[in-house]
A protein has these predicted regions:
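PRPP-associated nucleotide enzymes
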Residues: 1-266
Length: 266
């Protein structure tokens, strides 16, 4: 069994939903601080218990007193299963969000600082109120913000950066993948193809990143207004001889209008 790094204050609480991500980060940290990754680890051991009645409990098996704790969870990971009343259920974002909150509570305020790393922002599309509905994303962030030990919340490609307005104490770090996508396009696609790109935004959700691509490649674009009564259009005259790239913000359900935005070109 690996030993905890003793002379460093940093610790990782890695839930099973983010197991691979946590191991990669642990390996990089050990390499950075000069520890043998075969003997040491920054990951504290925990038990994740799902009970037959649907309740859950997180148990921490090592002390976190005075530590800078980073909790890693992937609420979009539905591959995990648990048994409830004789049925096998896949974990939902709600299950994993409650597990995260239980893990924070298990720290018992002993950690010096608590940081949350959540690649997919929970309820990220519920960022504004249109009718009689709940602002779940902002409510969760505000609830975490009220914990005096919370230092930062880290996510990637949030649907709307404006959700950070719901918090006042902890930091909200939102990292975009746009630059990485541009680097891979330049590296993997030949120059003649890059000159003939056309970027497509099926609704208003991805117009921001689409504009970054347009400015980078000086390309043309196609945009379908959200809520348009026209579902199918013929865009062949726009993409004839071009290489279309569909830029969308989120594929959350089978009914998504953007999935009906299909381009075919000769």
């Amino acid at each position: 069994m690996k030993k905890q790094v003793e002379c460093e204050r940093l610790r990782l609480m890695v839930f099973e939903s983010a197991f691979d991500l946590g191991n990669d980060i642990d390996h990089l940290l050990l390499k950075r601080y000069g520890y043998d990754d075969q003997k040491y680890t920054f990951i504290i051991p925990i038990k994740e218990n799902f009970f037959e009645d649907g309740h859950l409990k997180v148990e921490i098996e090592e002390t976190v007193r005075g530590k800078d704790l980073f909790l890693l969870t992937d609420i979009g990971n539905y591959s995990l299963t648990y048994n409830m009343h004789g049925f096998t259920n896949h974990t939902s974002p709600n299950d994993l969000m409650m597990q995260l909150k239980d893990g924070i509570g298990a720290c018992n305020s002993h950690a010096k600082y608590i940081n949350v790393v959540m690649p997919l922002l929970y309820a990220g599309r519920q960022h504004r109120r249109i009718s009689r509905e709940n602002l779940m994303c902002g409510m969760i962030l505000r609830e975490l913000d009220q914990n005096r030990k919370m230092k930062s919340f880290i996510t990637f490609d949030a649907h709307d950066q404006g959700v950070e307005h719901s918090i006042h104490n902890m930091e909200f770090d939102n990292f975009f993948a746009t630059n990485i996508i541009l680097e891979n396009l330049i590296h993997d696609v030949d120059c003649s193809t890059l000159e003939n790109l056309v970027f497509v935004a099926p609704d208003n959700g991805a117009t921001g990143r689409r504009n970054v691509y347009l400015n980078s490649f000086n390309s043309s674009f196609i945009h379908r207004e959200a809520g348009s009564f026209v579902t199918h259009r013929d865009y062949n005259h726009f993409v004839d001889g071009k290489y279309p790239i569909l830029s969308h913000d989120y594929c959350g359900n089978e009914d998504l209008k953007g999935l009906l935005f299909v381009i075919t070109g000769s």
